[in-house]
């Protein structure tokens, strides 16, 4: 009887491990049934350009107990209170919460917002998450949807910066401006007024991984504008994400910078999958692209601002080990840079694109129950 029980446990664990055995992020932590007692282990698991993001590791735990939101004088127990503290904090949630913010939530540096163990929804018709000139932020396990525009008004930016007037915002789910060392992992994002993720204004050292992007037209913008050349320093890794169903374009759309797009799974798009302007370097590796049935929309790529084919001929857009389905195709250009772009701490193994559907099958928010591995 005991041997049968042990066998059942082993089969169960093997079934879990098989879901992420080749995903280097998930294999770092998801097999731990005691994840709740070792939450900060997560900070050791990022890969790519955002692998140095420590979030609130080494700091205290802060527990969100209330969905209330006061943009100017947040109460202890609310998400805004924890997010705006100056010290390192690992923010967790005591219960399931639906949070409708009254103004964008400015997240101070050295913060992890960790939704594991609760069902956390942010948005719900209000504005959403904002980072400006901060470092070391991790967002994990959040449902972010229904993000709306905000009006101008006063907001507590952080304890140090105090309350300041801010302009109206466009309704992005996650906005990053001039940030470094940020990791966005295992979130589910959809249905917002503008984009789901914006990384702009010389942000760099960002990894966007294991997220599920769906039911949204303009998904991800990397780079502020065609005249903002400071984004040449931008380095972003986009890996192990599920795009779709019903994701239209900008997965991502880049300006300047170096973008590594690896082992993502793309459902059919409505316009294009990967695009850009202003000579970004885009290295597409090990992705699975399934084109829409529309014969005019089979191309994965879209180049913007090319007055003639020669204008963009030197842009480095390369496809390696990608898998193409239903007539999808990638138009490469520029010299072959290879993918030796990382230092030892950032590098990770990229599988062939045929493996991307399996690697991304658990993208988005996971179910995390005490004493069981997250699934």
Swiss-Prot record:
Ca(2+) binds at residues 170, 194, 198. The keyword DNA-binding does not apply. GO terms for biological process: pectin catabolic process. The active site is at residue 250. It catalyses: Eliminative cleavage of (1->4)-alpha-D-galacturonan to give oligosaccharides with 4-deoxy-alpha-D-galact-4-enuronosyl groups at their non-reducing ends. Residues 1-21 form the signal peptide. Glycans are attached at residues 110, 148, 178, 293, 352. GO terms for molecular function: metal ion binding; pectate lyase activity. Binds 1 Ca(2+) ion. The keyword Lyase applies. Disulfide bonds join 28-45, 128-147, 306-312. Its cofactor is Ca(2+). It is an enzyme of class 4 (lyase). Keywords: Allergen, Calcium, Disulfide bond, Glycoprotein, Lyase, Metal-binding, Signal. Its EC number is 4.2.2.2. It comes from the Eukaryota. Pathway: Glycan metabolism; pectin degradation; 2-dehydro-3-deoxy-D-gluconate from pectin: step 2/5. Belongs to the polysaccharide lyase 1 family. Amb a subfamily. Has pectate lyase activity. PANTHER family: PECTATE LYASE 16-RELATED, PECTATE LYASE 18-RELATED. This is Pectate lyase 1. It comes from Chamaecyparis obtusa.
């Amino acid at each position: 009887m005991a041997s049968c029980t042990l066998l059942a446990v082993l089969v169960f664990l093997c079934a879990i491990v098989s879901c992420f055995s080749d995903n280097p992020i998930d294999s770092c932590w998801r097999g731990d049934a005691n994840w709740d007692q070792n939450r900060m282990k997560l900070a050791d698991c990022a890969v790519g350009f955002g692998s140095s993001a420590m979030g609130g590791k080494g700091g205290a735990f802060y527990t969100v107990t209330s969905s209330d939101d006061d943009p100017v004088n947040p109460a202890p127990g609310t998400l805004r209170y924890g997010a705006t503290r100056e010290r390192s904090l690992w923010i967790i949630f005591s219960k399931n919460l639906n949070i409708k913010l009254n103004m964008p939530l400015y997240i101070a540096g050295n913060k992890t917002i960790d939704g594991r163990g609760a069902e956390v929804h942010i948005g719900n018709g209000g504005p959403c998450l904002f980072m400006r000139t901060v470092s070391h932020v991790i967002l994990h396990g959040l449902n972010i949807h229904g993000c709306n525009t905000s009006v101008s008004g006063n907001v507590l930016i952080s304890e140090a910066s105090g309350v300041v007037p801010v302009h109206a915002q466009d309704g992005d789910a996650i906005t990053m401006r001039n940030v470094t060392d940020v990791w966005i992992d295992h979130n589910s994002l959809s249905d917002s007024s503008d984009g789901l993720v914006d990384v702009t204004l010389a942000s760099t050292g960002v990894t966007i991984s294991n997220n599920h992007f769906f039911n949204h037209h303009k998904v991800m913008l990397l780079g502020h504008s065609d005249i903002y050349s400071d984004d040449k320093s931008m380095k972003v890794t986009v890996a192990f994400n599920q795009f779709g169903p019903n994701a239209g374009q900008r997965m991502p759309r880049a300006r300047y910078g170096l973008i590594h797009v690896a082992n993502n799974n793309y459902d059919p798009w409505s316009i294009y999958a990967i695009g850009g302007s202003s000579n970004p370097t885009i290295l597409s590796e090990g992705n699975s692209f399934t084109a829409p049935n529309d014969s005019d929309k089979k191309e994965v790529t879209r180049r913007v601002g090319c007055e003639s084919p020669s204008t963009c001929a030197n842009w480095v857009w390369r496809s390696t080990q990608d898998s193409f389905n239903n007539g999808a195709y990638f138009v490469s250009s520029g010299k072959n840079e290879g993918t030796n772009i990382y230092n030892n701490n950032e590098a990770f193994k990229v599988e062939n694109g045929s493996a991307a559907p399996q690697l991304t099958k658990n993208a988005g928010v996971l179910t995390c129950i005490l004493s069981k591995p997250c699934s």
